[in-house]
């Protein structure tokens, strides 16, 4: 985030101690009670900004499922700001294990200075602190950054709040219009990136969050891959790939991308060098090979294939060698997505029984020697699909659909859930939403 200047803030004795580190892989955890106090301000306008900053921080921490923000109505101590040492007994009295104090000021250059300190009320120690210099319009991102710092200090994992989501928005009235849309991870600042004049599918971030790629059907049989610069708004055609049905996924270094292309009755995985535009076919034989996704180090690719009759998940080296099957359960597997941490692969699993189909989102260990009984279903529904990961590899976002009823049309929405299968939440969008893709942490 080049428009934000960040400094570590230490006003009191800083300790490396934190509350017992939260490990969300151990299943459901009791949320840590935290008080986000009113931020001091140097003007009435900044007082309003401070109130909004507190709301965003509290909402971020609540959404994570790991923190329980305490209502300000129960606060006893009236003093606010970062320049005083809190009356810790007053905060312990309302069962606040953690306390956030902060302030908002306007600098001579017109930017905002937003500062915070995180306190442990039982040890009576400062855990962390920082200040951010931001243009006024970026106050919300500074609030997300503060929540990220708090999350990281208490969990040991990077936060994921200062991120973006790109997805397909679909109007709920006829004729239905599909557009590529962009929003903050929590649904704020939603905006449309395409005009709805053509069918659009599978938006994907490039290796940075500055560009996206998506498939657009100029005609029913001709799909184009577009690149859109989110800073300038400029758009260009990457390629006219006959037979492509999904946008490419990009290598971690941003130099290559993988995609599936249908030719002569089979669908295969291809890698494209983005500089030379040279295509390299990675899979062979008959069958449908789709949904490729790179490992975080770029050395492996996971994909699904029906070459053995039923769609299953496979891993291969990034040059197409050493193909290994990694799924062995009952049902069909689809849309694999490799965790940024490298430890898990998320997937969609479809089970057919008694003429009915059940869709599931699951995770499994990423490498063959680890598989055993590692597969775990974390949510199910009429139509759940398109799992993608938060940049810290701790939360999965996916789309969920409901069927049409006599008095209501079907709908699609975006949800998040942690990797243990707890804390499922809907991300509110202006219209129906599907095919989400999560950015990395913004610069």
UniProtKB/Swiss-Prot annotation:
Subcellular location: Periplasm
Gene3D superfamilies named in the record: TolB, C-terminal domain, TolB, N-terminal domain
GO cellular component, one term: periplasmic space
SUPFAM superfamilies referenced in this protein's UniProt entry, alphabetically: TolB, N-terminal domain, Tricorn protease N-terminal domain
Keyword Cell cycle: yes
Secretion signal, residue range per the UniProt entry: 1-18
Domain of life: Bacteria
GO biological process: cell division; protein import
Keywords: Cell cycle, Cell division, Periplasm, Signal
Function per UniProt: Part of the Tol-Pal system, which plays a role in outer membrane invagination during cell division and is important for maintaining outer membrane integrity.
Family as reported in the entry's similarity comment: Belongs to the TolB family.
NCBIfam families, A to Z: propeller_TolB
Quaternary context: The Tol-Pal system is composed of five core proteins: the inner membrane proteins TolA, TolQ and TolR, the periplasmic protein TolB and the outer membrane protein Pal. They form a network linking the inner and outer membranes and the peptidoglycan layer.
Protein name: Tol-Pal system protein TolB
Species for this entry: Rickettsia prowazekii (strain Madrid E)
Protein's gene: tolB
